[in-house]
Amino acid sequence: MATQLHRSLKTPAAVAVRGLSRAFGPRRVIDNLDLAIRPGEFVALLGASGCGKSTLLRILGDLDPEFEGEVVVPSRRAIAFQAPRLMPWKRVWHNVVLGLPGRPDRKRAERALDEVGIGHRADVWPKVLSGGEAQRAALARALVREPDLLLLDEPFAALDALTRIKAQALVAELWQRHGCAILLVTHDVEEAILLADRVLVMKEGVIAHHEPIALDRPRDVADPEFARIRGALLDWLGVAHGAAH
């Protein structure tokens, strides 16, 4: 396959994808997809399971080189998954700076952990963290790299409802503070509307719909415009309005 992945910010977009295709055997998961994300823009990506959302995110994160087309992404980018993927044999603070050049910088790790509200857990082993704390540690690990692009692959899916609400608020706050572009893959329509500047719907390997979100922040699910947008997105997803969030 012809692979062209460029790490650059010398374009007006934080992400520029042209003619992207990815096949697994005879099945074409992504089919000539185009996508642009502006610097500092928060974009949420919705779609049915298996439509190619996570594959797209992995390509943008340079975790899947077997694609056709052109992908332009920032040199500084980070990714956080649904599973925090912390190394169990390293303390939390060490996990945060794992992979950074030079000697492990504890102070840098502590600053990142403080920012996500778990500075007091720097010296514990990952196995003693709650699900919400582990996800915060994963966010700290991503943000300590000072990314221009943050890729989030269903980071809240395994959290209970209350912890999920807190995690959503934290991500919104961190985005405002850091100003990086974010691409969030999610199955939760309300989450997408609450957080994003723009919501995309992926179907049959392409971006089938763009929905700009012009609501003021913080957003209210009881707002009639919120309900209208939710209904429109559910229509694109082929879901009855009373059947999903």
UniProtKB/Swiss-Prot annotation:
SMART domains linked: AAA
Chief location category: membrane
EC code: 7.6.2.14
The entry's keywords: ATP-binding, Cell inner membrane, Cell membrane, Membrane, Nucleotide-binding, Plasmid, Translocase, Transport
This protein's GO CC annotations: plasma membrane
Annotated ranges, domain ABC transporter: 15-229
Gene3D superfamilies documented for this protein: P-loop containing nucleotide triphosphate hydrolases (3.40.50.300)
Intracellular or extracellular location(s): Cell inner membrane
Residues in coiled coil: none
The keyword Cytoplasm appears for this protein: no
Residues engaged in binding ATP: G47, A48, S49, G50, C51, G52, K53, S54
GO MF term set: ATP binding; ATP hydrolysis activity
Topology versus the membrane: Peripheral membrane protein
Quaternary state and interactors: The complex is composed of two ATP-binding proteins (SsuB), two transmembrane proteins (SsuC) and a solute-binding protein (SsuA).
Family from the record: Belongs to the ABC transporter superfamily. Aliphatic sulfonates importer (TC 3.A.1.17.2) family.
Biological function: Part of the ABC transporter complex SsuABC involved in aliphatic sulfonates import. Responsible for energy coupling to the transport system.
PANTHER family xrefs: ALIPHATIC SULFONATES IMPORT ATP-BINDING PROTEIN SSUB (PTHR42788:SF17), TAURINE IMPORT ATP-BINDING PROTEIN-RELATED (PTHR42788)
Protein name as it appears in the record: Aliphatic sulfonates import ATP-binding protein SsuB 2
